[in-house]
């Protein structure tokens, strides 16, 4: 199990990223628009820099829904490899069977 504080911090970052998503996209579009004057683009980049760092999507870590483990996660199941193996071996994931050839 991961530390509860790490899981909560990641959840907070995910909330902030969702909240600030529209603002970040709008500012990035202004910054990348070459038809606008340099002053406007620079002002938009300053506003983007003023936004909190934790509001960025890249700071959110993919974590296991059961254990909170941050490594070896499968996006499709939102589980880490350890939890996925336990659930699959007990038959709790529909359609997943142990391979044999």
Curated annotation (Swiss-Prot):
The keyword Ribonucleoprotein applies. It comes from the Bacteria. It comes from Gluconacetobacter diazotrophicus (strain ATCC 49037 / DSM 5601 / CCUG 37298 / CIP 103539 / LMG 7603 / PAl5). This is Small ribosomal subunit protein uS14. Part of the 30S ribosomal subunit. Contacts proteins S3 and S10. Belongs to the universal ribosomal protein uS14 family. SUPFAM superfamilies: Glucocorticoid receptor-like (DNA-binding domain). One of its GO terms (biological process) is translation. The keyword Heme does not apply. One of its GO terms (cellular component) is small ribosomal subunit. GO terms for molecular function: rRNA binding; structural constituent of ribosome. Pfam families: Ribosomal_S14 (PF00253).
